[in-house]
Amino acid sequence: MMKKKVKIFDIVLIVIFTVFSLVMIIPVYKVLVDSFDLKTAYGMKLFPEQFGFAGYKSIFTNPTMLRPFLISCYTTAMGTIMGLLISVLGAYVLIQWKMPGRAFIANVLLFTMIFNGGMIPTYLVMKDFHLTNNLWGVILLPAINVYNLVLMKNFFEGIPVSLMESAEIDGCSHFKILYKIVLPLSKAALASIGLMYAVGYWNDYTNYKLYITNSNLYNFQMKLRALIMGSDLPSAVEGATENTVKNAAVIVAILPFMIIYPFCQKYFVQGVNIGAVKE
């Protein structure tokens, strides 16, 4: 009787998750099909009526779309590296239990998660530091993320202190302990937090809207919105319709992480146990 109940429960779960999966996959599949369809036709189709790559050629051969794409790639790469660097160094400092004032620093950081400066004061500070209309402004601001720093700290705290103390007795510097011991044991945290940074930078729209007024510095999300709204359509390659170009742009916007995610998935499973003992 118990086995029968378990089987029924499993079947119900499978049905529910299958429905959820279809709800998420079907819209993406529709956009993908329409991005290759050179014939202007609306509605759901299993395959393109007139297959072609003209929509993607319109994106990558037009400077008004290619430049924002490259800017997004640059800011995502630089921002992710800087964000991870800040999180790793900050987390490593906060796990040094002998350091005086460690608890005070941690509490100050946590305080900023609850009470921030607000939009207007932040804008004024950015302006005073000449970081408006500057790509470094939209790179540096999200890089300082206390939430990610705390996650990294929790993971580091799961590494046995005895390992680091043994390395210190053997004459290792803090940099060597971090590089040789802590980071190799933290691949799951680095992958998980790194992807969170990367997704945030790639999808960043708000910071560009607030701090960037020079259209030459817009990222792909800013151009994508203008394209979808129909206010900034690029000159289409012969054979590409307006609908084809719009759908191709959407696919370009989501494709990088659809490719990256399967390779990082195993680290997310490990990342569920952030803070677990690794001894």
Q: In which residue ranges do the predicted regions lie?
A:
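A hydrophobic, multi-pass inner-membrane permease signature
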Residues: 2-279
